[in-house]
Amino acid sequence: MFYDIPATMKKEEAPQWPEGVGSIQATLPDGMAVEVPVLKGTNVLTLGVVGTGKTKSFTENAADILLSGDPDIKGVFFEVKHSFMDRFLVNNDKVLTYDSEAIPEKNLFVPNMIKEIRQANDSEAEMRELADFLFAELLNGANQNRAWIQAARNTFIGILRTIVDCFPGENTGNGTLIHALRRMTTGEILAYLAKNPRNHSMLLKDWGYDVHYAEEFKFTRRAYDIQFFLNQVLENFSGSFAMNGTDTIHDWLAGKYGRNLFFRYDLASAEISRPFFLYYMKKIKDYKLSNTAGTSAPILMVLDELDKMTDGGKTADWGLFQAANLGREYGLQILLTTQSVSNLYGLSTDFNEHITSGGLAGFPYLVSFRPGDPETISTLQTLYGSDYREHIIFPASRYGEPTVRCEMEPLVTEVEFASLEP
């Protein structure tokens, strides 16, 4: 007896994909040549184990097509390697990285936090945001030291406030400011903070320092503890972050530099680089999603191995999934490349799986090379969808009748994932 395979179980000869602004040539596991479309304004999540060519085969080429197709788009690149810099870096582009010797001087982004604060719409909010990132890791493990760390954070904000309010003509470089603070005694820091009346209540509350009776102030153990935690954060300023420069994200957004901005993440200096990278990436995201930004140039964020900022059990939440879910209407597009869905948990506060799973809704375009872990395969099967499939069950006896069972199954099976090239 001959049993034909139902039409519902036969695969289409070619995938039905929408047309994009360009395409990338690729080959399916069965040898079929296809054109993978590159869509403007659509976020893309690319997954696959190490060495499958995620960056070289798709992400780089997709970024090139999108940037070439619209000269107004600004590019933001994050990478641990140097693939994007080798291909897209031109004369006036800027590179934010720890090691100043690794980048040509004309391309090095040397930040100036005082100038950045002055250019913000709300300087007070900008100071708090910068301090939040710099003190985040201390506060996460604060326990009984939280009060002293919070006081050190308030002190750091007070120093920035004094410079911005009392010395309006000065954009003190990071190097000059940090080295001066490291040399100052506790008494000198308190006297400096007292120059700004807006700091007086903070001095009294956190330090027990009354500016009207400054000569009667006696240093307590609490004062030295606050100074200790402040110094810990000051030690984070090194490399290019402790140089005297004039560069700001505001100036790049305003078109004063080149078209592209590169975040070159150095794993050897991860503890120092992480808070600054998170601060600047969040600043770009907030600018694009702000209702006060008006009409501005679209931004393409090309993020390769962004989850490497979470190595060592640290989270790296700067609002990626908020940007993915809301950025389309504001002209923000994201190309995200990673090895595993599980790695993305670190991009949410406290490794929150629910935020990450919900954030995947912001990536309607999925490109899968060979996945290497069950969590990623299961997630992709869910995202690609399921359908009813017919199974013919042959009888054990030749006298029996075959039966047809209809079951809900993923459109992409584990066998098909395994057939992808390693």
Identify the meaning behind each predicted range.
Residues 2-31, 36-40, 44-332, 378, ...:
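P-loop NTPase motor domains
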Residues 324-422:
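Conserved ATP-driven motor cores of ASCE-family P-loop NTPases powering translocation/secretion/packaging/pilus
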